[in-house]
Amino acid sequence: MMPPLVLGAQTGEDILDMCAAPGGKTTQIAALTQSQAHLTACEMNIPRAEKLEANLHRQGAKNVPVMRIDARELDEFFRFDRILLDAPCTGTGTVISGNEKSLRGLTEQLLGKCARSQRALLDRAMGALKPGGTLVYSTCSILPQENEDALQEALDKHMDCELIPLDGTPSESETRRAQEAGEEPRVECNALTEAIAAGHVSSVANGMPGTLTIPPSRDFEGFYIALIRKRS
């Protein structure tokens, strides 16, 4: 799965998977860090938290505490080097074209509920980052209300956080640094930017350059992903 690869977690770091059940991305982070990071998973739904714990055990992910709380109410005490927020959403990226049954549950009420929750989760996630820490925000939706609109609102509130582009362009702070130093700006690369450059993944334009909307295809369900860093 792409979000844990973009997160780029390292051994020894404090890492949070905010909406972790059923645990596929959590176990991937544990594997990528060889269980040598301080990884915490969060899930407020008790049956889903129990399934998460069972999956972590089954996959051999060691020393991953599961907090059975609403991540929107995460204590101010907590601070993390990296946070993965794969937020609950309408799932429009998984809708099958022409399949009316797959559209049946998509209502304005559901969209509004998801959008409110996503904004609260983003607000808490940005607040819980350490200086220099990074956040991956992803959904399996392709609707702007759940993606770039929600993210822009959070960035407007958290002025100490900035977008790290995933489209092969430098960030604003890197552009300024390079200009002051008389250098070419550096572009941060990860598995997703490399896959796009190689033509393995296609994205479509959205309302926030630097974030990616991946449309549904034979190879992928549709999803949205963005990378944010809190300035040091």
Give the positions of each predicted feature.
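S-adenosylmethionine
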Residues: 1-232
